[in-house]
Amino acid sequence: MRVKCVNRAIYVLTVLLFSRLVVSQVVLTPSNSNADPKQKDTANTVAAVEANNDANIAKKDAESDLVIGDHLVCNTKECYPIGFVPSTEWKEIRPGQRLPPGLDIRVSLEKGVREAKLPEPGSENIGNEEEDVKGLVLGAEGSTLSESELKETSEDLENEQSGFKLNNAEKESDILQQETDLKIAVSDNAEATSNEPAGHEFSEDFAKIKSLMQSPDEKTWEEVETLLDDLVEFAHDYKKGFKILSNEFELLEYLSFNDTLSIQIRELAARIIVSSLRNNPPSIDFVNEKYPQTTFKLCEHLSELQASQGSKLLIKRFLSILDVLLSRTEYVSIKDDVLWRLYQIEDPSSKIKILEIIAKFYNEKNEQVIDTVQQDMKTVQKWVNELTTIIQTPELDELHLRSFFHCISFIKTRFKNRVKIDSDFLNWLIDEIEVRNEKSKDDIYKRDVDQLEFDNQLAKSRHAVFGNPNAARLKERLFDDDDTLIADEL
């Protein structure tokens, strides 16, 4: 029992030394050369446990498949800020995050992660041992050593190991020296890092583009076009696309929107943006969060292209960017009046793309933005008319039919009687419900759960959305329990 108390006290003093460090990667062991070998072994065991935890954390970082940009760190599941935001409570340091200086940092032996928080007021007073010891967590069980237990354990330690005494003044001096050395090392490292240019594997290519733009002529723009053409190939890659976009989006946006440049250069820059965004959620989230005005800029430049009868290919690129950005957002808006004017262009593929954008904007996920924007109901009615017309086209595929139908239903539910639905659409809806009811009798058709779910929504919407809601409720009661329905209700 006494040996356990001795070991426990040694552990407390050792962890107390570790808690004063300002850099989480550095692990210090007691430097008292007068301590006997048994005491040193105990301290070394604690240091080994901490080192092992650091190794496990490093291993997790290596296996997390991180993509690190200037502002975000992304893995296959989520993105989070690259800068650690401290608070007064212990917070986990996420893989790849950068820490501001001056934080209290520890390794949680219970969780196996690094944690940091803002220093406590007056924590600079290293001699205040009682405050340092309070709340100190010991072992994986999370037990806490109280002041009375610490005093009792210290007395047992002095009786059992009379030869081992740690002088408070020497300890304070040792810790102060360690902190001074570490601050110097961190300062030197930060200075060295600040002198290194921030870069990525394509930074030389973009640096050359920027250099060529300083002295523009026909030859230099040809070189810029060649460089952009080479970069298009890499933009399709998940990781490389994010690196390009997170580091060079402003340059690519400038090249795309600059109407003084050739269509070839503008189109290539826009194509790099589209390729970096497509099927790349971290890239989409990065642009939406850091550059939320991009969708408005796209609408403005689309309006200019439409007014000047500009390149149809560039229009398609801008529409594709807008379409992808709207696929993962609840915080950006569009100018649907601009899109309506653009919709008048006689280009079937562009018309479909514009309707896809409208279907993404008028959606339940985007309701917060729609509530804050003054809607022109004349334009909204025009979109409803177009959607209800094109959805009746026999050649329209199932995916577009579902997307357009959900949009029509949302607009009708959201704006109610302010939007009118023509009888042709209602007749088509009745016929479509009957056709799908017949198909549902087929065993193979029944296997498609998503298809049956959509067919059910289609049937319910006939009265619940586009008709009389009371009739819908009556129909449900007839279907669920027609035996109990009284004659008056029929």
Curated annotation (Swiss-Prot):
Subcellular localization: Endoplasmic reticulum lumen
Keyword list, A-Z:
Endoplasmic reticulum, Glycoprotein, Protein transport, Signal, Translocation, Transport
Source organism lineage?
Answer: Eukaryota, Fungi, Dikarya, Ascomycota, Saccharomycotina
The answer to keyword Glycoprotein applying to this record is: yes
InterPro entries this protein is in? Answer: ARM-like (IPR011989), ARM-type_fold (IPR016024), Sil1_fungi (IPR031884)
Name of the protein in question: Nucleotide exchange factor SIL1
Q: Which Pfam families match?
A: SIL1
Name the job this protein performs.
Required for protein translocation and folding in the endoplasmic reticulum (ER). Functions as a nucleotide exchange factor for the ER lumenal chaperone KAR2.
The organism's superkingdom is given as Eukaryota
Example of a GO cellular component annotation carried by this entry: endoplasmic reticulum lumen
State the organism of origin: Kluyveromyces lactis (strain ATCC 8585 / CBS 2359 / DSM 70799 / NBRC 1267 / NRRL Y-1140 / WM37) (Yeast)
Biological process (GO) annotations held by this record are:
protein transport
Q: Where is this motif: Prevents secretion from ER?
A: 487-490
Quaternary arrangement and interactors, per the entry? Interacts with KAR2.
Q: Which GO terms describe its molecular function?
A: adenyl-nucleotide exchange factor activity
Q: Which residues of this chain are annotated as glycosylation sites? A: 258
- Family, per entry: Belongs to the SIL1 family.
Signal peptide (from-to): 1-24
User: What SUPFAM superfamilies is this protein classified in?
Assistant: ARM repeat
